[in-house]
């Protein structure tokens, strides 16, 4: 059984598309991580935090990991808004939780030459026209681990504003092993510090 949880208290959990996909093969329910853990749930799909966590939520995340159950966490190091073209590092204790389990999520953004496009308005005479432009902050992932069933049948994934992940296998004894599921292309790079989110370099 799968539990869907949301760490961002400022926005609601939007699961319509995900729920329709999961319902074809799995039993699932939304869960509140500030409430007692449901022993029937084997895997938790958890959306990312944008602020520090309630102590009950943190205690439950630790208890879930210590019990041997699994957490699939979608977390970025940077809070972004494409409409205002603003980006700021996220200040949250979720990063210390991840680091305690050997995962170092960097506060940067991954860019990739193989990316999706966004529509940019430009003036042509008296008219405003939409023009598609490559947007490297939306990398197109096409490199998957074919030996892992969770991603082996995927053809493409499009993450929005992903951050770099480093795995500490030396100093953390909780890391039994690391399996790479997918990765960006060889044309990828990083943006740190001064975040320029405009898709049009002339703006």
Annotate each language-model stretch with its function.
Residues 1-2, 10-11:
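N-terminal non-catalytic structural scaffold regions of very large proteins
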Residues 4-6, 75:
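Short beta-strand/turn micro-motifs composed of small residues
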Residues 11-203:
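Acidic, S/T/G-rich, low-cysteine, solvent-exposed domains in lumenal/extracellular/periplasmic regions
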